[in-house]
Amino acid sequence: MIKAILTDIEGTTTPISFVKDVLFPYSYEKIEEFVKNNLQNPQVQKIIEDVKKEINKSDASLEEVIENLKSWIVEDKKITPLKELQGLIWEEGYKSGKLQGFVYPDAYNKLKEWFDSGIKIFIYSSGSVKAQKLLFSNTNYGDLNYLFSGYFDTNIGNKKDKQSYVKIAKEIGFSPSEILFLSDNPDEIIAAASAGYNVIRLVRPLDADHIDNFPYKQVESFDEIEIGRV
């Protein structure tokens, strides 16, 4: 019996285009100004040091740090200090009203239905927990954070690593067989399934394609997901 949902965001609850065409360009445009204006912020200081560790250059200049961060955005690298910095930048954007999150109508309706029925819902995204909460705090359906019992990012592990899903199951207190994982990424689906999760792959028409002979269920919309039939 499914007692918990663990869902991805990008390409699952939210269009990839929102992340790629709205959030990423916004952070790229603002990153240099934000870092230079917040050098006294302990969080920013730690991010700068983490970038230096990531590139194995402890004496890297601020300009080198910023250029690496910009390159990682362009290359869509899932690197923790970048994701944490993007979260801080997006926070300013959401608070100023320049950014608003977007959630698919079918995702909103199903998430609310599951929440109302007592199923616990958790988020697992490569974006930082801060960025996840920000996206859902200001959406086309208002603040949706009340729907979620917890959030996970790459601090718990890589999304394509079986052990990440083992850790999450322990953390939320459900056995893998009681959890349904939703994602558009086939490698993440396979990793979660190998940890014993129930899995369904989202194939949004504009974001992904059906994979022939894929060993797990694929759907185009949350409307096709019936918990009792998983």
UniProtKB/Swiss-Prot annotation:
The keyword Glycosyltransferase is annotated on this UniProt entry: no
Keywords: Amino-acid biosynthesis, Hydrolase, Magnesium, Metal-binding, Methionine biosynthesis
Cofactor binding annotation: Binds 1 Mg(2+) ion per subunit.
EC top class named in words: hydrolase
Superkingdom classification of source: Bacteria
A biological process from GO: L-methionine salvage from methylthioadenosine
Catalytic activity, EC: 3.1.3.77
Self-association and partners: Monomer.
HAMAP family: Salvage_MtnC
Family affiliation: Belongs to the HAD-like hydrolase superfamily. MasA/MtnC family.
Function field: Bifunctional enzyme that catalyzes the enolization of 2,3-diketo-5-methylthiopentyl-1-phosphate (DK-MTP-1-P) into the intermediate 2-hydroxy-3-keto-5-methylthiopentenyl-1-phosphate (HK-MTPenyl-1-P), which is then dephosphorylated to form the acireductone 1,2-dihydroxy-3-keto-5-methylthiopentene (DHK-MTPene).
Name assigned to this protein: Enolase-phosphatase E1
GN (gene name): mtnC
